[in-house]
């Protein structure tokens, strides 16, 4: 089966990581560094928690390992909000992996935040897409 055929059949929900690791825009870079190291991940999703008591976490941005390295190298005292990519590439869980792969390629990003009704619910990486294709091919 061709890879493009596999990508058309599978959805983002089939391959994404659920249970995202998040931070607040006000978190210091030490906290973001610790979260990435603890979970062995390449990005942390920055969320706007909304008013106290509200269950309304909204995507604010993404701090990737690349932005983190730049921030750690800065002489300034920065927080996650200072280095997060605000024009975050996002995708819906029901989108095809083909759509997600094209979005990653056109945006030149290695991760997409999976958003359902405005709320971040997962992360899809290029490696997740590769693993999904490999798993389907292994079943042949």
PLM features per residue range, with description:
Residues 1-140:
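Tandem CBS (Cystathionine beta-synthase) repeat/Bateman regulatory domains
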